[in-house]
Amino acid sequence: MFYSRYFIPTIKETPSDAEVVSHQLMLRAGMIRKLAAGIYNYLPLGLRSIRKFEAIVREEMNRAGAIEMLMPSVQPAELWEESGRWSFYGKELLRFRDRKDGEFCMGPTHEEVITDMVRREIKSYRQMPVNFYQIQTKFRDEIRPRFGLMRGREFIMKDAYSFDVDSAAADGSYELMFQAYMRIFERCGLNFRAVEADTGTIGGSSSHEFMVLADSGEDAIVSCDSCRYAANVEKAESRPAAGASTEEQLELTKTATPDMKSIADVAAFLGLATDRTIKALVYSSTTGEHVMAILRGDHELNEIKLKNCLGWDEIQMATDEEILAYTGSPVGFLGPMGLKQGVVVVADLALRGMANAVIGANEKDMHYINANLGRDFTSDRFVDLRNVEAGDPCPRCEGGKLEMWRGIEVGHVFKLGTKYSQALGATYLDADGKEQVIFMGCYGIGIGRTVAAAIEQNHDDNGIIFPLPLAPFHCSVVALNTKDKGVMAAAEEMYFRLEQQGIEVLFDDRDERPGVKFKDNDLIGIPLRIVVGSKGLSEGKVEVKIRASGEMLLLSPDEAVETIVRMVRDAVTSAQ
């Protein structure tokens, strides 16, 4: 491709509305342009990287036995009402009516559509296992779209759906997709983790997220420094206390704590560490239920864990008025002792290892010291409620410690079980002629989001540093003086030789200053660059620059071509 005939509208200045590096660089590199909030045009350079990633995804999906198809973006409301998600999904679901007053939505995902197709077409156990996938445009009406392709409203996604005769077979399909995802992100040259995750609005029994590690990542994840355990912080398990404390239980005492409403204030006032305190938090459901959660004062409540253990769809912090009505206690002095009848208390597992703790006395300006579980207060149930922290012991191995990372979610796989097949009546006849419900899995990858995440992980002050498998071009050939016929002839010859060997080359034949060409080539992130100038040619040399390392090589034109071809082929071979 000749640069002068291509369309790469680079920008020198960083757009003021671009908050994260990938958004800034994709705009500056001429890869995308905003059409409306969260909706983007993919310009030629950006589309090349998108197509590169799609090709890797297709190869691995096909290798894993998945079958490509394409479903409509527009979906009828009836299917979503059958699954129960029409009212549950919320305002992210873009709904509209056609001229006949029929209700529809723009698909944010396709569980209902694919299950509807399967219930019509698959009737026998002999037709399974089967796995369908598509690469499709989705739409989710995000309340605050931002970060470019990282959190847009319209986006490209690969989604796959597996159908099996039973749970064991579904586990096998899940493992096939898990391994396919591992290969996909390994082939892209990305530093990533596969982590245990919450199933969220999709539902199902278990799931894994695939996280590209980046300091700018919105998600907090943990991994063990000794074993392979890794999880999103929403899902990460804390290791239970070894057992009840052996510390001697002291006499319970009520003490004044005037205007000390926070854990930090109470601990400081009493001259104790915050890990000697217990905090109480009250939450409510959308149906008016309430619960008190208690945990160590230095720990943070994980609301996802609380919601899941209660089986509630949503939870929210109770208002001061709700807390007073439910517990009879003023805010700031809540505790698990002396509560009104009917108050449900859920305790974190770590409390089993505490003794002589400080708790709220359910009375203004008063706390108890030396409160002990079992003797002074009880809990209706004990569950893992807290967020894990860096340095916590690993829940899966002995001696391992948890490390904290920031990550960008680029893929998610779910064991759905019978959630959708049961709701939509997707059944089959087994070998005995009996009707059974189909077991499902679903598997998503954000296409544009992965390209953006690759940029978040791979960039410097000069621009993008694309991993070679995702780069729009493998190599650029830069002619320094386009008016020098010898330079142009040598550069053109190298360009055509590389193309003939399957190398994707951008020939920078523009009549621009060398500095402009170098800046643009660095900005758009092409991994390899050959610089052809009159001075070098007079010595029989050209310059090869490796973008990621900054290494420069002075080689003959023949050596340069051989080096580029070898590096590209090595990268492609290792990725496969």
Curated annotation (Swiss-Prot):
GO CC annotation, single: cytosol
Pfam families: HGTP_anticodon, tRNA-synt_2b, tRNA_edit
Domain notes: Consists of three domains: the N-terminal catalytic domain, the editing domain and the C-terminal anticodon-binding domain.
GO molecular function list: aminoacyl-tRNA deacylase activity; ATP binding; proline-tRNA ligase activity
Gene encoding the protein: proS
Task of the protein: Catalyzes the attachment of proline to tRNA(Pro) in a two-step reaction: proline is first activated by ATP to form Pro-AMP and then transferred to the acceptor end of tRNA(Pro). As ProRS can inadvertently accommodate and process non-cognate amino acids such as alanine and cysteine, to avoid such errors it has two additional distinct editing activities against alanine. One activity is designated as 'pretransfer' editing and involves the tRNA(Pro)-independent hydrolysis of activated Ala-AMP.
Origin species: Pelobacter propionicus (strain DSM 2379 / NBRC 103807 / OttBd1)
Family classification: Belongs to the class-II aminoacyl-tRNA synthetase family. ProS type 1 subfamily.
This protein's name: Proline--tRNA ligase
Class of enzymatic activity (EC top level): ligase
Reactions it catalyzes: tRNA(Pro) + L-proline + ATP = L-prolyl-tRNA(Pro) + AMP + diphosphate
Signal peptide span: none
PROSITE patterns: AA_TRNA_LIGASE_II
Any one GO biological process: prolyl-tRNA aminoacylation
